[in-house]
Amino acid sequence: MLHTGGSDAPVTTGNYIDGVARPADGGRTYALFNPARPDELVGHAALSSVSDVDAAVRAAHGAFAAWSRTSYAERAAKLNEVAEYLESGQDDVDQRARLFCREHGKPIKETHLEVLRLGERFRMTAAYADRLARDEIEHGPPFDTIITRQPRGVAMLIVPWNWPLSILGAKLPQALMAGNT
């Protein structure tokens, strides 16, 4: 949940759990300030509680059975939809980059690149669908190896503050492509 009143207006973010944008349990938030300009309020983010995390994990467990049974082609199609959304509209990309610049105090060039690369990571992962579609990969002599792929369950991703979109892009699309939630 992201509410903006303009490109540099303060934003309010919440949780997105089980397909629904919602505030943190109890409605608690914390203020985000621009580290490069400590008096500039960037916005407010949800101060999630244990019950919010539990709700997210329950939702992910609930979605796992259906998602893990989808084909690699179906997963790739969804990842490409996400990439298209992330890359759509130069104005949206620029606005996201400005927001991350203000939130992290990073140069705009870095945040712009990070926003664009997130979509690329989803698209690159989706491109592997055909290679992953085989249930087993057997290597012949001199190797006695069989690789099988099975979704494991819920993936919890914690990303650092300094490159949040880059780290997310290096973990989330792959977990989803593997059939995890």
Where do the language-model regions lie?
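Hydrophobic face of amphipathic alpha-helices that form TPR/SEL1-like repeat modules
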Residues: M1-R37
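Residue-level signature of catalytic and energy-coupling elements of molecular machines
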Residues: G19, R75, F122, A155, ...
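Secondary-structure boundary/capping motif
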Residues: A24, E110, P164-I167
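A short local loop/turn or secondary-structure capping micro-motif enriched for an aromatic residue
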Residues: A31-L32, S49-V53, L165
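Conserved strand-loop elements at the edges of beta-sheets that form or border functional pockets
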Residues: N34, L47, R149
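Glycine-rich loop-to-alpha-helix module at the N-terminal edge of alpha/beta enzyme cores
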Residues: P38-A133
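Conserved small-residue-rich beta-alpha loop and adjacent elements
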Residues: D135-T181
